[in-house]
Amino acid sequence: MTCCVPDADKEILLSTSKAAFGWELIMDLYECNRDTISNEKEISRFARELCDIIDMKPYGDPQTPYFGENQEDTKGYSLIQFIETSSIVGHFSESTGAAYINIFSCKEYDVELAENFTNEFFGAERIHSRFIIRE
């Protein structure tokens, strides 16, 4: 798999069997736009737009609780957006400017499109991603 994200650090873990249970994209984004990752409305908008872009049907509204207030590195919003075929989850560290996002679905989706959209939405300077086909 090639990707359009410049300087992306990628790992691709492919199944050896022909049947797949699901597809999981795990992204660690660094040096994100701090205004975006610390804005609950923007994080919710990301989840809704991502669902549209990768053709996933959301199940309910995104949930965006604020967690980790006791530790500076973990303080920030978390995200869970259930989709009919699984979920989109994330955590956003305001102090480090990092975002950690997983997209898991039993329905195949365009991984590069999801990665590029996520990177652009959060304005990350650097991204490390892993893609796993689950058996």
Task: Report residues per predicted region.
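Polybasic/polar functional segments that serve as interface/processing modules
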Residues: 1-135
